Amino acid sequence: MTDSEGPSRTVLIAALVLAVGAIGVVLAIAVTRHPPLQPVAIATVPAPHAQDPPCRTLLAAVPQRLGDYQRASIVQPVPAGTAGWRAASASEPVVLRCGLDRPTDFVVGSPIQVVDQVQWFEVRQDDRSTWYTVDRPVYVALTLPPGSGPTPIQQLSELIGHTMPAVPISPTPAG
């Protein structure tokens, strides 16, 4: 082959390698790119202490990620004292509410679970659960979808332990 017959074999191989590499990069970007997270809709519930200093401090410090969940915007109007996270693979969000009233089911003798020095009371609703802190100056609720695993409650327990002092629990008298 002479120079007048076209590009050399080396140039053709280099061009082919570059083209395959460019296609590989485009495919890798397409596979790893996540669609934008949908905003989280949070119903308004009474939260008389949502503007109290402990809630403001907590909400200012919540992380952008809770395990596989990423902080998401909240549909307007945003209820006071709330934050939400979504996972690309999950349809249900993780929702945090701060400044709520004491849960009505939290009575003397209710089972409590401790996660990283924070005491939680669980309320089950269909296939999800809501956990309430019961040993802090304000009640914080964390609603977890099925399959969310322990990471969200562990990370938030650590944060709550650092941002809010512990107080004695105060369940409603039984009966």
Please report, for each region that a protein language model flagged, where it lies by residue.
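Extracytosolic low-complexity repeat regions of secreted or lipid-anchored proteins
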Residues: 95-175
